[in-house]
């Protein structure tokens, strides 16, 4: 998932409020979908559909499509858009929109092709939503830079204290040769840094959060599963604090983990905040994923079931300091009564103290799913937050999930509360494959990577991608066409007025 970075950290509340009240009509950057594209636009049909009459969407790029500017690249896998698109991050460069995308690939690839995770960097014409260029800052081929399952992501720049900007991404895997390392890709794609000081764990996302004077603050979510590091449900919330961008990149900041009077998320009551703090994890950069888990267990870290994505609040007045929304995908096998308990997924909010983000934190359970059988959203994975609302994407993750995978919208209310959920879009799994989404049958897709794109594409604009896990795709290798049996996908534009 990913976050962008163009609201200045020192912007006044009145300016932010003005942004929040922007009109729903066209803006200077709003795309004209009827205009002749200046670059490449996929010819493939949309892999999702809207559920509301006022919403609209458009496919931009499909897995296997050619990347403009890479026609002469000797590597056929770098001439096309790679499978399993995931976390996104974007920034504006003149009249271009630069969009980074993770590709959540393992070392084995897809049918033996595309081994290891990649990061693509696309150049988009925001006026026509067409692709004018593309490349791979992380290719999946460079010795020393072979990674697995790059998941959610964030682009952080000057607003968050990271200068010209870095695309933050990390390995979700901590087994099978993966170490669970956090990465930063420079805005122009010229450099990739490993950031071991941010901790080795199953990285879902690390977001940079403005609002703490004189510090760069990052919040990380641990997407740990019982199969990875033991049998219990123990997923943690991390905080990294550094003096400036150089300190983040050099690893001279400090890593902390959240701790509270309660021990796990199953003990929370909806709407009732608890107090906690972040305790330092000494020597974090030298710890393996297993050693880090042992260390934070010893520190009494608060346990979630399986944290997923996070994003920070952009609405003024919700709290006195930085606030972060985060989701837990839950697990139907969670041991309620003895361990962290969250069967179908939850949405949380944590408020930080701007004077000292490690102290006086307040965590609140905003909503907990009752599962799809009750008509709820479920298995939340990726989120994005605008000044008006929160978007949530589902990744079907439990037996009994038996309907199309959806994107949901929650209006933000007073003090950061959530309005009633509204289903905005759903994936076209059955239309493309003939199979309904059903777990654990393995027929489900997922949408991912959603970001608020209103800054560049007009009010109510979002970008997201689809991981079409059971959909075959093709790509061109010279005179030959290569067919792969699974892991199609797509990048799409979504507009929901008022969001």
Model regions: which residues?
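C-terminal motif of bacterial Sec signal peptides marking the signal peptidase cleavage site
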Residues: 16-18
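Sequence/structural signature of beta-propeller domains
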Residues: 21-499
């Amino acid at each position: 998932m990913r976050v962008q970075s163009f609201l200045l950290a020192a912007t006044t509340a009145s300016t932010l409020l003005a942004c929040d009240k922007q009109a729903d009509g066209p803006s200077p950057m709003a795309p004209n979908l009827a205009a002749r594209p200046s670059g490449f636009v996929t010819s493939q049909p949309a892999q999702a559909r809207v559920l509301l009459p006022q919403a609209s969407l458009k496919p931009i790029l499909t897995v296997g499509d050619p990347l403009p500017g890479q026609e002469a690249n000797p590597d056929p896998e770098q001439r096309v858009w790679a499978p399993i698109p995931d976390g996104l991050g974007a920034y504006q460069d003149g009249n271009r929109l630069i969009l980074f995308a993770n590709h959540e690939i393992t070392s084995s690839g897809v049918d033996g092709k595309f081994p290891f995770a990649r990061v693509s960097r696309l150049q988009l014409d925001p006026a026509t939503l067409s692709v004018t260029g593309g490349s791979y800052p992380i290719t999946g081929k460079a010795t020393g830079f072979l990674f697995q399952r790059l998941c959610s992501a964030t682009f952080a720049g000057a607003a968050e204290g990271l200068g010209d900007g870095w695309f933050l991404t990390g390995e979700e895997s901590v087994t099978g040769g993966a170490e669970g390392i956090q990465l930063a890709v420079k805005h122009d794609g010229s450099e990739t840094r490993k950031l071991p000081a941010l901790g080795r764990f199953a990285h879902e996302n690390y977001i940079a959060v403005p609002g703490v004077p004189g510090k760069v603050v990052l919040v990380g979510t641990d997407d740990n599963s019982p199969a990875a590091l033991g049998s219990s449900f123990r997923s943690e919330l991390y905080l990294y604090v550094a003096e400036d961008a150089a300190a983040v990149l050099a690893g001279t900041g400090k890593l902390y983990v959240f701790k509270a009077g309660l021990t796990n998320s199953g003990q929370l009551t909806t709407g009732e905040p608890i107090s906690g703090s972040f305790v330092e994890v000494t020597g974090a950069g030298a710890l393996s994923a297993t050693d880090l888990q042992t260390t934070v267990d010893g520190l009494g870290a608060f346990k979630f079931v399986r944290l997923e994505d996070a994003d920070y609040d952009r609405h003024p007045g919700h709290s006195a300091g930085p606030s972060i929304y985060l989701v837990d995908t839950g697990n139907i096998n969670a041991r309620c009564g003895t361990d962290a308990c969250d069967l179908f997924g939850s949405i949380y909010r944590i408020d930080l103290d701007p004077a000292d983000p490690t102290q006086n934190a307040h965590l609140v359970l905003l909503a907990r799913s009752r599962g799809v059988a009750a008509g709820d959203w479920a298995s939340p994975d990726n989120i994005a937050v605008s000044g008006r609302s929160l978007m949530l994407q589902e990744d079907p993750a439990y037996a009994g999930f038996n309907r199309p995978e959806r994107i949901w919208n929650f209006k933000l209310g007073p003090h950061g509360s959530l309005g009633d959920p509204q289903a905005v879009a759903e994936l076209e799994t059955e239309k493309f494959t003939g199979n309904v989404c059903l777990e654990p049958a393995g027929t489900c897709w997922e949408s991912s990577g959603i970001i608020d794109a209103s800054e560049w594409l007009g009010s109510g604009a979002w970008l997201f991608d689809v991981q079409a896990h059971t959909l075959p795709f093709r790509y061109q290798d010279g005179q030959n066409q290569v067919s792969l049996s699974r892991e199609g996908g797509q990048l799409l534009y979504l507009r929901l007025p008022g969001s």
